[in-house]
Amino acid sequence: MAARPFVLSLPATSANLGPAFDAAGLALGFALRVKARVAEVFSVRASGRDAEICARVDNHLILNVYRQTLDAAGRLAPPLALELENAIPIGKGCGSSAAARLAGLALAVRFGGLAWSAEDIFAAAAALEGHPDNVAACWWGGLVVSRSAGAAAPPTAPATPAPPTWLRVPLRRAWRLLVAVPADALPTERAREVLPAVYSRQDAVANLQNALLLVEALHQGRGDLLAAALADRWHQPYRAALCPLLPALQPLAGTHGILGVALSGAGPSVLLFLDDQARVEASAAVNQALGRAGLQAELLETQVQTRGPGMNWGRWERPRA
């Protein structure tokens, strides 16, 4: 009898959340689902969003991380047959690379016999990403605040001298979310290039105040505070020219049941927090604002994914018969 495949679901994420630049992330309710089994040769079958990108075996991010991790550990990488069901927009600020890197690491541990814990996988993924915010939310689920603790370099072993510190923030409210996704992707490197190297004390203090207020507002379910708490001086003003959805939608904060608006990750997608009773009105207002600006976007209604795969690591998911 053939061994059952290994199945893993990795949620999309929205990081930065306005002022919490490189420090907070939120897991979203749509995901990359990976099914893998040992095979004679590497192969990938993909369905869903960006399936043509996901199906490329050559230079495949999941498989590259899988092979490189086992090579660094001195282990052989058994060929895998992957089946991917993807709902995460690629290159649009929704954590697609974090999900892929976590998938590759999880596959390396599962099929390469590495004695890594969930913490080891998270630390390795954060090193590969260069910052922990997306991988923390994807791996642990919910709202996660995190802190880098040293230079990020690809690991050669599961234990790193200074792994990131993370903390899940309990949410008293099931936040309703809307993600506005444009047609064109934006490389994170390009979005980083436009940021200044130095910030003023005034801007630093403003962001610190807003970030602290934001985390507590999300924890307590205080939607009335989000419009102010999502204000940012560190990255959104500089990325607005690359992410035209943001200036088009930011004026909607506090109106039409839209509680707050922020760039999703480095963009170009935009995350909106909604009042529970105003989803239809909010979507209509977003479409009208986009129309006035001559813009188009796909609107994805979702909620916070409260648990990530790292919370159940070791309890392998199995496909139903």
Name each model feature, range by range.
Residues 1-92, 110, 114-116, 151, ...:
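ATP-binding N-lobe of GHMP and related small-molecule kinases
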Residues 38, 148, 182, 272-276:
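Short beta-strand-to-loop capping motifs
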Residues 218-321:
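Glycine-rich, charge-dense phosphate/pyrophosphate-binding loop(s)
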Residues 181-241:
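Active-site rim beta-loop-alpha module in soluble metabolic enzymes
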Residues 1-2, 16, 25-28, 74, ...:
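Solvent-exposed alpha-helices and their adjacent loops that cap or buttress functional pockets
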Residues 30, 92-118, 139-144, 148-149:
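DPxDG-like acidic metal-binding loop motif
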